[in-house]
Design a protein with these regions (language model features):
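Sec-dependent signal peptide recognition
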Residues: 2-12
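Cyclophilin-like peptidyl-prolyl cis-trans isomerases
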Residues: 13-196
Length: 196
């Protein structure tokens, strides 16, 4: 049995079946977590490098068992002049090592994507260092775009998609118990699969 077809009854029961097929240049991904499910739309047309990287982690099932481990709220960023609100997820360090090399930074000045509410973006240190960790914006976060002040290098982060179903799940994870920015306990990603 095709694993994607096996998910169809679950999607219908949860009300998560996409009402519209993904448009050209996009792919949809079902994320099942211990706090609820969401559907992501990955923009393969405008952010091809970042989207391809994310989807290869999905297809290799390296996000299965990964965790939303970080919640950044206005109140838990002491000493930070530019504050943001996001949740961040990624595989364990051991699983991440089985992943793929870092990718070039696709700047929002090139892709035209912006860090709006529900947008997906890659976590990074310096430019061209993103691998598996990603985050979801809670509210609009323009300081994460190219030229924004959150990262001192001003290069911004690579937005590559958005949550199209399940924003209440994002907000539940954002408000979950945390010690500083570390979710306690982390929210487990049971599985991530492409949708037809």
């Amino acid at each position: 049995l095709d694993p994607v077809l096996a998910l169809a009854p679950v999607l219908l029961v949860l009300g998560l079946a996409p009402q519209v097929s993904p448009g050209p240049g996009t792919a949809r991904v079902l994320v099942q977590t211990t706090r609820g499910d969401m559907v992501l739309e990955v923009d393969t047309a405008r952010a091809p490098v970042t989207a391809k990287n994310f989807l290869r982690y999905v297809d290799a099932r390296l996000y299965d068992g990964a965790r939303f481990h970080r919640t950044v709220r206005l109140a838990n960023q002491p000493g930070q002049a530019v504050r943001i609100q996001v949740i961040q997820a990624g595989p364990s360090p051991a699983r991440a090592r089985r992943g793929f090399p870092p990718i070039p930074l696709e700047r929002t000045s090139v892709t035209g994507l912006r860090h709006l509410d529900g947008v997906l973006s890659m976590a990074r240190d310096g430019p061209d260092t993103a691998t598996a960790d990603f985050f979801i914006c809670v509210g609009d976060q323009p300081s994460l775009d190219y030229g924004g002040q959150r990262n001192p290098d001003g290069q911004g982060f690579a937005a590559f998609g958005r949550v199209v179903k399940g924003l209440p799940v994002v907000r539940r994870i954002h408000g979950a118990p945390a010690d500083g920015q570390n979710l306690t306990p982390p929210i487990v990603i049971r599985s991530m699969r492409r949708l037809p």
